[in-house]
């Protein structure tokens, strides 16, 4: 272990004064001359980032994806998009970043997946009420949760989309190719925790949690900022703190201040 790596393990509040550099791998540096940035290219530029005084790198989504929403439509939480390299490339990048005293934060989309994700492909073919069907939110009518606003009105006319395989509607707060996970299902919690454990056990220093206000649905509400969402985030924080040391969870709640304040907790 290098001195920089040892120092990283002893900085409890490292994020308080971190200089965080946001990187979209695909547009940063191309090591193979194929017109696409990659992890080998990012690795080549670590000395440059270190010279700038950067102490943490925040990576935008790099997972396998149809790329209909710039990678936020994730098709596999456990791998790297082939355009950007391999898991081995990522591990080498992570190791070399740490050797320079640079931490790494990655994006994790909690609310939804791509409709190409294996979970959804299983769900749409599963029987109603079965383990895989309940990974997502289904209905035989598009009339539920009418109080929930449509976020992308220019592109979507409803928060429900018909699936011809399942013969039912599925819920999506974002684009219709991004079905929402069903957080009323404890198995979804377990699956997401496995994803988190995979990356944190690899050595990732933090997660930027995307689209957290929309995790739960409840009739008669806006389906945003529900008490169940706060409880899940507390559960997630406890899970991470129990298993890992000094890891940051940077959650996105794109809400008005009076609605966002509850996400800060009360001493917890």
Predicted regions and their residues:
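Acidic/aromatic-lined carbohydrate-recognition and catalytic surfaces
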Residues: 2-193, 201, 212-267
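Active-site regions of oxyanion-processing enzymes, predominantly non-cytosolic
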Residues: 199-209
């Amino acid at each position: 272990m290098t001195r920089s790596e040892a120092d990283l393990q002893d900085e409890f509040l490292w994020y308080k004064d971190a200089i965080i550099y946001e990187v979209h791998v695909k547009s940063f540096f191309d090591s193979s001359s194929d017109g696409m940035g990659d992890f080998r290219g990012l690795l080549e530029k670590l000395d440059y980032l270190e010279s700038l005084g950067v102490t943490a790198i925040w990576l935008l989504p790099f997972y396998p994806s149809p790329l209909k929403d710039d990678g936020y439509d994730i098709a596999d939480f456990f791998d790297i998009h082939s355009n950007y390299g391999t898991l081995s490339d990522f591990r080498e990048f992570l190791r070399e970043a740490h050797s320079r005293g640079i931490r790494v934060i990655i994006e994790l989309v909690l609310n939804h997946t791509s409709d190409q994700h294996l979970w959804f492909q299983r769900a749409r073919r599963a029987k109603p009420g079965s383990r895989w069907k309940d990974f997502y939110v289904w209905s035989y009518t598009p009339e539920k949760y009418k109080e929930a606003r449509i976020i992308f009105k220019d592109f979507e006319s409803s928060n429900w989309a018909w699936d011809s395989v399942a013969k039912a509607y599925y819920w999506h707060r974002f684009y219709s190719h991004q079905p929402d996970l069903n957080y009323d299902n404890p198995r979804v919690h377990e699956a997401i925790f496995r994803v988190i454990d995979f990356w944190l056990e690899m050595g990732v220093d933090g997660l930027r949690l995307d689209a957290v206000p929309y995790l739960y649905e409840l009739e008669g509400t806006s389906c945003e900022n529900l008490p169940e969402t706060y409880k899940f985030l507390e559960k997630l924080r406890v899970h991470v703190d129990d298993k890992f040391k000094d890891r940051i969870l940077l959650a996105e709640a794109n809400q008005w201040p009076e609605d966002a304040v509850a996400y800060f907790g009360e001493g917890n």
